[in-house]
């Protein structure tokens, strides 16, 4: 924040602590969970923090800084009204409102993202917990879109109104509905013969390949540039997860997002709990294998683990 006052917020990466060896609140060794659900979320976090947010920050399109790991300029936050109490997506909403306030005042500003700085969180280990979390994220995104709908395609807000906000609407409002309709209409088209099976298969494969390439690229970026995995076995596990997530996990997330839309339409404001197993003094779900890579990289991963409020992550 030591600049000319234009920098109003800075965010960092959040990594998955499930499967890591934790001692007295510190990460001693980085590991990967035995369970598939946390592994899929690990890939998802890599993709969100190392691809999407880095790119959006560089293009001045960043709308979200995770509430658990962000720093805000106090005067800008207070001037915008601080955190709202009537939304379930307060981290997204407050940054949108801060940037909206700066645009309306005609003041230059910046929002930065530092991928090399990270904290660690425990992600949901059950489908019910993941469902509750993603339902609330989706509901919070819709609340923010409607609260600040005057920004949509409004040149007064520059890139924020002309690019960032339309992208948010496309991803969080139209995206789940269109993808669900696709899963429904493709089988119908195949049954009634107005869709070529080859086209349907090719379209599905292209979607999976694109998702896998994005996930694999994020994993390689993390491996080569930031915080490598402790063992080759763990890296292979994540690489496999980046492929398998396209077959079931992704579709399940879309159902949870549709559930979030339904909760919004019903006016549901409840904050559904996400069960936590806890990471205190954990030795990790997997035994961290002693190999040459682990010996060289243990110290660099010693970082404090703090329990994050539910909702921090790759939305």
Where are the regions that the model predicts?
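Membrane-proximal soluble regions of multi-pass membrane proteins
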Residues: 129, 133-147, 238-282
